[in-house]
Amino acid sequence: MRRGAIGIGTLIVFIAMVLVAAVAAGVLISTSGYLQQRAMSVGLETTRDVSSGLRIISIWGYAPKNTTGNTTIQSNITKLAIYIAPNAGSEPINLNQTRIILTVKSTMVIFTFGGEDTVADWTNGAVNVFNETIWENINGTKFGVGVVVDSDKSMLSNKASPGMNSGDLAVLLINTKLAFNKYGGIPPNTKVVGKILPPHGAGTVIDLITPATYSSEGIELQ
């Protein structure tokens, strides 16, 4: 009887150990699966952040000439046109969620997207980018968008939230006369620093010094 009881007790203990081991194994498998999914998710996010973003093609400024009588004076830069394209392999970039930070002398301004009224269709060209009527809708804290290449219509089909995809080309339009009205725009020989910050991916640095003198209305800055 005692041997039988001991045998049954041992069997019960053995079964309990097997059950505990099975439960533990299930927990480990579940945890392992979660960690694997989490690692894959983090990896995808990291890849997206590294490859995504915008690159600057060129930056142009507009310094209009003001004529009074026989005297012509070249004003400060009153408008900026920043030509941008997505990085190679970038995820789509929503310009509605993009921010631009610019610092001129002691003034820093954060620009946000100005809405569908500040989006212009330039896919068929523009006679003079700085004289287009779209500038009338751009104030000192908003930026507009000139759409140059939009093969899949990702920007023009939804002007309220334009998305840039691979192969697209756009111009970010900034009214520097209103943004930096303290200086009447951007003066000659002035350092301009800033960043274009997309909703994901690395920010794009702006770092330039304007020419010592403005000899023409259209000035390539970067």
Curated annotation (Swiss-Prot):
It holds the Pfam family Arch_flagellin. Keywords: Archaeal flagellum. GO terms for molecular function: structural molecule activity. NCBIfam families: arch_flag_Nterm, PRK08541.1. It comes from Pyrococcus abyssi (strain GE5 / Orsay). Its main location: other. GO terms for biological process: archaeal or bacterial-type flagellum-dependent cell motility. It is found in: Archaeal flagellum. This is Flagellin B5. One of its GO terms (cellular component) is archaeal-type flagellum.
